[in-house]
Amino acid sequence: MDKRSSRLRRAKRARAKISELGANRLVIFRTPRHIYAQLIAPTGSEVIASASTLDKEVSAQIEKTGNVAAATAVGKAIAERAVAKGITKIAFDRSGFLYHGRVKALAEAAREAGLQF
């Protein structure tokens, strides 16, 4: 089993548990160059808000896109967009990525900006 399939197995288990909760979920996807965050409705069919290092608002604040500072900016942006739509309680879906580094920075920035999870 390689690294990617292990991550996808972890993600599958986590998503099954989150779907039982019936809460909006904050989904993270991380590449070496960028980080993406989407707030998805409990049904899984609607994206409520999104932010990434490719957004013009976020990329104007940062120098590089693949570091902790960029992840912090994305976390703050997604939280502001969610709070603007009246959503504060969510479930955090890290997509099988370890809660460390950029994933942790994004989560902590989202918490500081008003999301609860």
Curated annotation (Swiss-Prot):
Lineage here is: Bacteria, Pseudomonadati, Pseudomonadota, Gammaproteobacteria, Alteromonadales
What is the annotated quaternary arrangement, including any partners? Part of the 50S ribosomal subunit; part of the 5S rRNA/L5/L18/L25 subcomplex. Contacts the 5S and 23S rRNAs.
- Please report the organism this UniProt entry assigns to the protein: Colwellia psychrerythraea (strain 34H / ATCC BAA-681)
State if RNA-binding is listed as a keyword: yes
**Coiled-coil stretches:** none
Which Pfam families does the record associate with it?
Ribosomal_L18p
Q: Give the CC-aspect GO terms.
A: cytosolic large ribosomal subunit
Q: Which family does it belong to?
A: Belongs to the universal ribosomal protein uL18 family.
Source domain of life is Bacteria
User: What is this protein's gene name?
Assistant: rplR
What does the UniProt record say this protein does?
Answer: This is one of the proteins that bind and probably mediate the attachment of the 5S RNA into the large ribosomal subunit, where it forms part of the central protuberance.
Q: Which GO terms describe its biological process?
A: translation
From the Swiss-Prot or TrEMBL record, what is one GO molecular function term? 5S rRNA binding
What is the protein's name according to its record? Large ribosomal subunit protein uL18
Q: Which UniProt keywords apply?
A: Ribonucleoprotein, Ribosomal protein, RNA-binding, rRNA-binding
